[in-house]
Regions:
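Asp-based, Mg2+/Mn2+-dependent phosphohydrolase catalytic module
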Residues: 1-7, 11, 115-116, 120-224
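Structured helix-beta-strand junction loops
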Residues: 104-105, 132
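Proline-centered loop/turn at the N-terminus of a beta-strand
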Residues: 107-109, 185
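Residue-level signal for alpha-helix termini/capping positions
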Residues: 100-103, 160
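Generic structural signal for small/hydrophobic residues in well-ordered secondary structure
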Residues: 12-15, 56, 102, 110, ...
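N-terminal helical cap/lid subdomain that shapes the substrate entry/recognition surface
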Residues: 2-97, 104, 115-119, 201
């Protein structure tokens, strides 16, 4: 960590607190497509429409129509949505426990690239994750998504926290690099151990800062 004492923690959700697998969506859509499973996997991309959907610029119905055309799906919106929400594998409990522990020390926020349909699903499936945070910021509600610089600037504004005083945890290198360019402290998460390892020195740093503040107040009181 950098020398700046953290004032808030910011976590990604997918890949950090919730395990996701888009292969599950491909498997669910396969019976409705004229493409092979391999062709489906190749055809599904995080394309322009995907990003627009995550910014809330288009509704689910328009995005599902795009998927139906791109993946050659002869399926209803309900059937496409069933596959779309099948990506959530489970909660990464070890990280959630760490967030809950840190919340007693610092404000804990989440910022996730998502959409209204996925948000409804993970909010229902993982209430413990949702409840672990002071606030969850979502790309489709902000109209901004990672790794856009404006997205990080907006989070700093909404939390009233200087960028250099936020520690950000994400599983994608491009998001971590973008956060650093925006001035945040950032950690690449490949496993819950990366979160735990990064938090240990952070807690020591906070305790040291707290101790120095206490000692300063003590001596100022004596001198007064």
């Amino acid at each position: 960590m950098t020398a700046r004492t953290p004032q808030a923690l910011l976590f990604d959700l997918g890949g950090v607190l919730v395990d996701i697998d888009f292969g599950r969506a491909i498997s669910a859509w396969a019976p409705y497509s004229s493409l092979s499973s391999a062709e489906l996997r190749k055809s599904f991309t995080y394309d322009f429409q995907y990003e627009r959907h995550e910014r809330g610029e288009i509704e689910a119905a328009e995005y599902f129509d795009h998927l139906a055309k791109t993946l050659q799906l002869d399926a209803t919106h309900e059937q496409i949505e069933h596959g779309w929400t099948a990506i959530f594998v489970g909660e990464i409990r070890q990280t959630r426990v760490l967030v809950e522990a840190m919340r007693g020390i610092l404000p804990c926020y989440a910022f996730t690239n998502t959409n209204a349909t996925h948000m409804a699903a993970w909010s229902r499936l993982f209430p413990g994750v949702v409840g672990a945070f002071d606030k969850i910021f979502t790309s489709h509600e902000l109209g901004l998504r990672k790794p856009e610089r404006a997205a990080f600037d907006r989070i700093c504004h909404l939390t009233e926290t200087p960028a250099s005083s936020i520690v950000f945890f994400d599983d994608l290198p491009e998001n971590v690099q973008a956060a650093k360019k925006a001035g945040l402290q950032a950690v690449l998460v490949r496993s819950p151990d990366d979160v735990a390892t990064s938090l240990r020195p952070l807690v020591r740093q906070l305790r040291k800062a707290s101790g120095e503040t206490t000692r300063r107040a003590h001596w100022e009181g004596r001198s007064g």
